[in-house]
Amino acid sequence: MASIRLEMDLRAEPAKAWDAVRDVGAIHTRLAPGFVIDTKLEGDARIVTFANGITAKELIVDLDEAARRLVWSVVGGRMTHHNGSIQIFSEGDGCRLVWIADILPNDLKAPIQAMMQQGMAAMKKKLEAA
């Protein structure tokens, strides 16, 4: 199983960053505009449309307020397994965002990691822009 872990420090209050992450239906406006162009809620899942035209159905697995951690799983599509999480940690005058994805098949690691890096850049721009 391929495992991807990306981390970044943010000049943003942890509560503000977490509020954007936990708003699962507004990724395209509150968390990663430009990287995600639309989000629709469908029961316990969200349909995410990325700027590159890819759409993904993401089942929301857990929203842990105390740990500031969101967990989701992409269902359908080319991946036979996906578990993703974003967690916000207080750090210094700001916070640290940690995004982890475990995926199968392994050969999707490079393209998924490239997309995640684009997502990190979009999140940094949005969350630090207040």
Predicted regions and their residues:
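Hydrophobic pocket/interface hotspot
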Residues: A17-V21, I27, R46, I60, ...
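Short, conserved beta-turn/loop elements at beta-strand boundaries and strand-helix junctions
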Residues: D64-R68
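Short, highly charged C-terminal tails/helix-capping segments
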Residues: G34, K125-A130
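Hydrophobic/aromatic beta-strand elements that line small-molecule binding cavities or substrate pockets
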Residues: M8, A56-D62, N83-S90
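A generic beta-sheet turn/junction motif
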Residues: L10, A51, S90-G92
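Beta-strand/loop substructures that line and gate deep hydrophobic ligand-binding cavities in soluble
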Residues: V74-K126
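Hydrophobic ligand-binding cavity/cleft-lining segments
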Residues: M1-K40
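Glycine-centered tight beta-turn/hairpin loop motif at sheet-sheet or coil-to-beta transitions
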Residues: M1, A51-G53, M79
